[in-house]
Amino acid sequence: MKKITAALLCVMLVICTSVTAFGATKSDVKQKTDTAVAFAFDGNYSKNGYDVSSSKNLYILARSGADISAYTDAYFKSVAQAASESKLTDPGTIGMAVCIAKAAGIDPENANGVNLADALKNADVSVVSSPYNYFYAIEAAKALGLNDTVKALSDTLAKYYTVGTGTDFWNGYGTSPDDLAMFILAMKTAGAYDEYTEDAYKLLETYYTENGYSNYGANADSTALALAAYSIAGNTEKADAVYDILIKNFYDEKTGGFKADYDEYYATADAVFALSFYMPIAQEDGQESTTAPETTTQAQTTTAADNKNSDTSKKSPSTGVEIAPAIGAAAVALMAFAAAAKKKKA
């Protein structure tokens, strides 16, 4: 009887401490990416083509792996016009143009006559318009081997960060999960300010809820950008867990896009962006699911907690998977075996 009880207790402990994070295979991620592109881009953004003012959407489309050749002529004519009018000044916009050129097989040093590499190298790093654009600029500078530009951009970006409170790009309005995620992407790409990046991950977790990452409510955009932030670090277990939440709570099987209260096309574009980071670390087809660790970083108490949802059901913070049923099942099995053993002994 003691041996049976001990064995069952071991099983119960294994069940209670090993919650599976399913994540997705590369085929799963590609399928979600393809339907999202069809919804947000084929069905909306791509209908009128792209110019320099819509660089972000063409950049995301290029990141998805879609064929962008139908749009590049008009786009780079627009870039050339902006350059000729001295309007191509934001390093982020230049960075996106560089990445688009590379994706299309166009030389960034001669994109419709514009030397984008020189434009990025000579741009004023203080005129970057958003945390997103710091990432785009750093990504492009890194790809072009412009190490001094990468350093100048990351040094300027770091001035917006305070350890313990995060970023503030908005003159006192503070940080958000979206800004923290983009800060992480930029600094991870630059390979700079590791102390700030680690702090940003801790702060990002204060926005975690079981329904997704919350910015005045759980939403697809914040959850997707958190997925990108964990993916770029190669944190497969955490990325798998966030991916599961993103798909479960925000993917729309009917449209193939991602749900949002205000703009489903915008939310879907952010999801496509995030999936491009997750794809390299997603499971190979046929690979078995991994097992999430027993615990994850606990959310710290900050003012961000005011924005969280109040769902109090007990789930693993690593996966969002309910653990009570597993505990209950193990307990029932234990009692059943104990009763059977007692009856047999009698």
Regions found by a protein language model. Give the residues of each.
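Terminal, non-catalytic domain-edge segments
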Residues: 23-35, 245, 260, 266-297
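Alpha-helical repeat scaffolds
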Residues: 34-40, 70-84, 110-125, 149-161, ...
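Predominantly the C-terminal beta-signal and adjacent terminal strand-loop region
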Residues: 243-261
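Positively charged n-region of N-terminal signal peptides that target proteins for export
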Residues: 1-11, 341-346
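A cross-kingdom C-terminal cell-surface attachment/processing module
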Residues: 321-343
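An alpha-helical repeat/solenoid feature that recognizes helix-turn-helix modules
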Residues: 43-68, 86-107, 126-150, 163-197, ...
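Sec-dependent signal peptide cleavage junction
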Residues: 15-31, 312-323, 342
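C-terminal low-complexity, Ser/Thr- and acidic/Pro-rich disordered "stalk" regions positioned immediately N-terminal
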Residues: 282-319
